[in-house]
Every structure is written in structure tokens, then in C-alpha cells.
Amino acid sequence: MSIHPVVLVGGGPGAWDLITVRGMRALQEAEVIVADHLGPTAQLDKLCDVDAKELIDVSKIPYRAQVAQERINEILIEHAQAGRRVVRLKGGDPYVFGRGFEELTALTAAGLPVEVIPGVTSAVAVPALAGTPVTHRGVVHAFTVVSGHLPPGHPKSLVDWAALAQSGATLSVIMGVKNAAAIAAALIDASLSPPHPRTHHSRRLPRWRASIPVRVG
């Protein structure tokens, strides 16, 4: 029995046609697709013959349905060890807050080969499609991607908001809608001088509804 690499595919920022060509080919070759709502699953039929695949839903809906990461790892291992061609379809890029490295670690510990196909992260794609560059010559020469799922001051947060406020870089905050007010306050408290331009993109593509230019302060 042949063992095939488990392929971790970055599905891009939401729209089905923003996945990479290599990612699409991996889906077409797969026998099993392990996907959650963060990838382009709603229009998966535009990328491959869904009826010819086993599609396993491992929902990751914030504050609602969740499949534990440990169980996702087990599913990937079980099907790969059975000799099936397995794709793990993820949103954005597998390694940008996608827990892709956790899956790679579990798979390699089980003695299984892994291939990673990068994806376009929403941290750059969504601002770009809304007309907001994350860098601009003579204005900003750096950008930082930050998780906002924990508020500033949370004991488990690893983000130094004070340092970011002083960095001069564009901040692209992912999963930050719930804590947007607290994040803005923390940046101001750390001397990010208001008014400071900020654009709020409330959803990933194609489901985001509006881009709202606002100011911190």
C-alpha cells in the first residue's frame, strides 16, 4: 500500500478563485478533503468534482461549533495511513493563524509525509481588494499581522501592543472584531497619536460587507 503526502492547502481569503493553481490541483487529485468554514467550501464544486470526494466537515465556527484540533489531527492520520490521498483545506495561509504547523507536527510524528501549499492571507488580500495598501513608499515600510482574538492585557495574550504602537508599521489585526475597541484603546494608551487612520474590514471575502474608514482616537 502506498502512502501519499497529506497536503495542507491554503484556500485564500474566501473567494474560490483566489486559491492558488497548485492548491486547486491538489483538491482535484484528492480522495478525502478535510475542510472547515474558513476555506472556500461553499463553492468547492468550482474547484473539483465534489461528488467524487469524501468531504469531511471539521467546523471551526467562532463561539459555536468546533471540532477539537486533536480530533482533526486524528482524522488526517487515519485516512493517510489507509493509503488515501488527503487534503486539509484551510482558509488563508496554513501558517498564518491556521494551526497548520500543529497538523504538520502531528502528521510527521505519525511518520507521514506532508506537503504545504501556501495560500493568500486575508491580512494582505482584504485590504488590497478594498484599496488599502499595507506598505507604501515614503509612508510605511513595514507591516505586522496580529491576532486580536484575545484582548490586550489578557494573561494568555502574547502580543505587545505597546511595542506595536511605537513600531510605525501597518497593523493588520485578524480575528479582532470582538476586541476592536479594547485594541484601539491599548494602542492610544501606548502613545499611538490620534487621529490615526484605520480601516475596518468586518468579514473575509467574499462575505465581508463594508470597509469603514475610521480613526483611532
Write out the residue ranges for each language-model feature.
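Class I SAM-dependent methyltransferase SAM-binding "motif I" and its flanking Rossmann-like core
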Residues: 4, 91-167, 216
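A contiguous loop/helix-start segment that scaffolds small-molecule binding in enzyme catalytic cores
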Residues: 3-8, 82-86, 140-142, 147-217
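Short acidic, glycine/serine/threonine-rich loops at helix termini
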Residues: 20-21, 46, 99-101, 127-129, ...
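A generic local secondary-structure boundary/capping motif
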Residues: 22-24, 77, 131-135, 159-163, ...
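Short, charged, surface-exposed secondary-structure boundary motifs
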Residues: 45, 64-70, 125-127, 146, ...
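A generic structural signal for secondary-structure junctions
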Residues: 48-49, 131, 150, 188
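Class I S-adenosyl-L-methionine
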Residues: 1-16, 21-120
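Short hydrophobic/aromatic-enriched beta-strand-loop microsegments
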Residues: 52-59, 113-115, 134-144, 191-201
